[in-house]
Amino acid sequence: MRVLYAILPGRFPTVGYDPGLWWDSVAVDARYQLSSYSINFDWWTVLIGQPFARLLLDPLSPLERQHRQAAWSANDLDVDGLAVAAAGALKRCQDPSTYRSQESYLETLAPLNAFLGLVNRVQSEFLVDVDVGPHVRNLDYSNSRSLVDYSRSSGLLSRSIDAAIVKVPATDDVVLLSITSPEDLLTALMTARKFRARRPSVHISLIDHGYENFSLSGTIETLRARRSLDSVFDTIISSKDERDETVPALLEAIAAEKAPKGFIRRRDIALPSRAPPAGGAPFPPPPTFAPESILWTRLSKRRCYWSRCTFCSQNAKFDAPQAPAHSEILASLDRITAYAEAGYGQFMLSDEALSPSSLNLFANEITRRGLRIKWACRSKMERAHTPDLFDRLAESGCFEILFGIETISERILALMDKTTEGLDAMNVAAAFRAMADAGLGMHITLIAGFPGETLQEVRQTVAFIGRTLGACENATFALNQFQLFADTPIGRMPGEFGLSEVGKPGDICGPLSYKLAPALADEDDRLHSEMPRIRDELDTMLGWFDIEAIPGGPLARHLYFYSGHGAIFKSRADNPFANPLRTAELPRPGNPKSSSSIAAAE
Amino acid sequence: MSSKADSTIETMRSPYVMVDDFLPLDAAEAMRLDIDTHFGNSESHRPETHQVWNYWFVPGHYAYLRTTPQKLIRPDRVDNFMQVLRRWSAEALGLREVTWPYLSLYVSGCRQNLHNDSANGRFAFVYSLTRDRRTTSGGETLVLNEGDLFRNNVATAQSGPGFYTSIEPRFNRLVVFDDRMPHGVERVDGSMDPLEGRFVMHGHIRDKGAIVSGALTEEQVASVVLEALIDFSGEALARIRLYHGPVVFRLFIGASGSVKSCAVLLDRVTAIDANDLGWPKMLSSLVAKLTALKFPEASGETTVTQPVLMGTSLFRPGH
């Protein structure tokens, strides 16, 4: 039986996402011919290049095409010229030499940045963004029926997916899909329809729907009752916890012509569990627009060990809140070793927060085994994050830790239920210095506008981050704005946080609207109106503001901060973006500084 | 002007065309935001900034609000729109005069009854800044079908689309139609909120002589083209009166002065008699004459876009 794991059109691919443990066992099961295909890689290749204009013009009559092209010309939009340049840039994203200097990276991204802007200016069906991929304008992504209805459309998005799947043979008996966002859900629905049209007998299963803040787990019963998603997918695996056991069982049931239908759990498949074949085979690195294969994976299927933050919806994906056991970490390391041998150079551990003790164990074991890998992780700042621990982590190949600092206001931390006894702003600053001393990079996330937070508190946090990160290398940050999600403590008790008139959640997880109590609303309005200025101030403090004015700069900054490209840079000893306050003046239009002087300064 | 090679030029013969996503989306959204801002914060409205609308009411014919767009939209944005429209019109239609637009607002009850603008221009343009998601209905531009609506349908039951084309006022859509076509605007119904209404910028497009780009000057071109037109008029003087409307040619002239090709960019010539079949032959004759022209030698190639009007002047004296 031929089984395809299809990577869906979505965010700009710079890393490979681990499909899960099920892959390793199914891949070595002789009954199945398992393969994967990145439709996403092909989709971006279709979008960023000359096929884009063809797809846009295809449905028009020759006269309409002539008139549309005349409109581009009248608007000074050189669609074909920019497409050629952008397609070249896309290829150069895979070339290691692109990442040698600020200048070469910015030069590479400039035409890509320009073309992405053009894609969003010359058509109004969807907005394309490197973070999410295509986002259809004016579509209600919180409603599964809206998505199912739209998935029948024959617009530009549909045609671009058609163009991206032409290389996928229509011979698979089973197609497995994973989604990470509502946008992915739409492309999954559209892709599923196309697979079905090519081969009506194919079984299409949505096997995973949990990533970061997104998960269908909280609304799975509503979705089951609405019969929307299962009108397109044959099966949907309800629980992410059970995915790795359910996928092999599902394949076995399909092979035995006893395929279940609809939302399924492991217990719905009556076949007895077979022992998985011995050994396993790693998920082969999918093509990406990065020069190195990076695997986005996890150490365990455990929730964050803290699991208390009142704003956090990430816990909805998994059931078990305990920190991973010693044996689990060792098993994960065995798997990572196999994946490193299969060609992955870097590992991004996306567990919401690994405890200091888990990290300590993981790092020690890497060092003991003499494994040479580069890795990054996420953690929650604790007193146990000592200089010694940071040294050990760096020694084992860790190059970056993400910390959700959120705010330095103790009052707001208490409201967030994220207070750590004995850990104040001074301790946090000391931890940052210790990380820098150990040679570790850091990505710091903040939340502004938590209900009740004042503008002054946000400014204090931003000033603190500006001061402390300015002295560090390889430090990036995200100043997020508070969003209300249903499946969170604050979403369950909005009144206790001064929230009212909370928007009715749809059946697809997403942020909810709300109103603040009058006593809090004015300050919150002021804070929101100041946010663009505060962001600019933080960028200025840390030397990132000027880069926005350089062609390619906005995209370069974004990919450096939030994609696998950042890992490529940060894992090097000579990262040209290590600290923009210390590096040479960035090249800007009209800046007489020559490229050679910039390179020399670096 | 970057004109397409003649072999790929399609002749526009339809009575109307639509160009979706006419402006870059950000440019269109900026203009719409100016409109939204104008209507926002109603407490701060002042006579000098907000008493700007002309309620154009002609009993039985027209009921809508109109103004000059720069009273709501930042002037440089309106200028940009006009510049783009002029360039587009020159490239796509071969007509380079575009009248300054009105900005019109249709709220509930507003409409335009059927009429034509035969005395106003060659083509009308309607550029929509209406929201795609709105709480009103109606506001479509209606353009009657060509031909004899009675005789063409005597044996066939027909309704709306059988008699006219209804064009939705989609955001950032440009509609251009033959000014001689009977047209109107479907009555808008629903909310009285102006932001839910139909906003369009509209005006007329006319010919204003040849458009010349390349090595030859306008003067060099005009005198040679005139030869062909005089020759054609001499041969077809009596029959020219049987036809009405614009035809636009695009000539590609080599450095040697020879015409490399002559394409028909637009042909909206209509016979007074619906049964007349003579125009295609006359058009071929005119194309042949233009193709045979010999222009002065020049340092490079030249593209000439030449409108020719059949029939008597469409314009009122002094217009």
What do the predicted segments below correspond to?
Chain A
Residues 19-22, 51-52, 191-192, 219-224, ...:
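Short secondary-structure boundary/capping segments
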Residues 30-32, 168, 172, 232, ...:
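A structural motif corresponding to the C-terminal end of an alpha-helix
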Residues 11-15, 43-44, 183-186, 212-215, ...:
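Flexible loop/turn segments at secondary-structure boundaries
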Residues 3-8, 201-203, 330-442, 448-453, ...:
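Conserved SAM/AdoMet-binding glycine-rich loop
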Residues 219-248, 392-401, 460-484:
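Structural recognition of alpha->loop->beta junctions
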Residues 173, 310, 345, 399, ...:
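Short acidic/polar active-site loop segments enriched in Thr and Asp
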Residues 6, 10, 14, 22, ...:
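C-terminal accessory regions of radical SAM enzymes
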Residues 4-24, 30, 39-333:
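Acidic, low-complexity intrinsically disordered segments
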